[in-house]
């Protein structure tokens, strides 16, 4: 059995790591490189960095800190933020990123996924999906440009349909960001993640809602995800990654210690 992965997420804005609640009201958490080094030392399996306003403001993630992170850590990391061309992706990979993730740019131009896959191979192409549960229609819908509250907009895609589309186009991994759960630490959305898991032939990463160690256990066992991403519980030192992994191993979950 493949080991499950623990993935701290660092949202970056104006050169600092920030964290919001339900994608709003972001507060500064700390500096990028020291936080990355801390999580690597604690035992994170990989890191994800989102330049959260890049797509909404029509720019690409700042490469200067990407190279500094690559020099400081020895675990894989993924970078996202406004990547719209093969050249931009190539540059970020050359600066040391192991994977690149696209979200809003893929919604604007789905062919980007196929082009990235053709150029670099699907193993380093991650698709982020910002999924919002709409109670009125009892459905999951995809939102775009979520890094800037003023720029956030609805798309025509239902989450399940977009999950199938991005796989057809060649993504290697999917991060499902459950917007309703983000930052509230009430647990992952097991129902939605389980639904997506049934449609997903590539690795699925759960994002949004981690508050306790049991939440990680539950999402691995019940939703059968491949990795669990979290931010605020790590930023606020509510959960130590090494202790989390010991707990999960004791609960019978395959994990790298």
UniProtKB/Swiss-Prot annotation:
Enzyme class name: lyase
Record keywords: Amino-acid biosynthesis, Cytoplasm, Histidine biosynthesis, Lyase
Pfam assignment, any one: His_biosynth
Gene Ontology molecular function terms on file: imidazoleglycerol-phosphate synthase activity; lyase activity
Disulfide bonds: none
One GO BP: L-histidine biosynthetic process
Biological role stated in the UniProt entry: IGPS catalyzes the conversion of PRFAR and glutamine to IGP, AICAR and glutamate. The HisF subunit catalyzes the cyclization activity that produces IGP and AICAR from PRFAR using the ammonia provided by the HisH subunit.
Family: Belongs to the HisA/HisF family.
Annotated protein name in UniProt: Imidazole glycerol phosphate synthase subunit HisF
Annotated organism of origin: Shewanella sp. (strain MR-7)
Phylogenetic classification of the source organism: Bacteria, Pseudomonadati, Pseudomonadota, Gammaproteobacteria, Alteromonadales
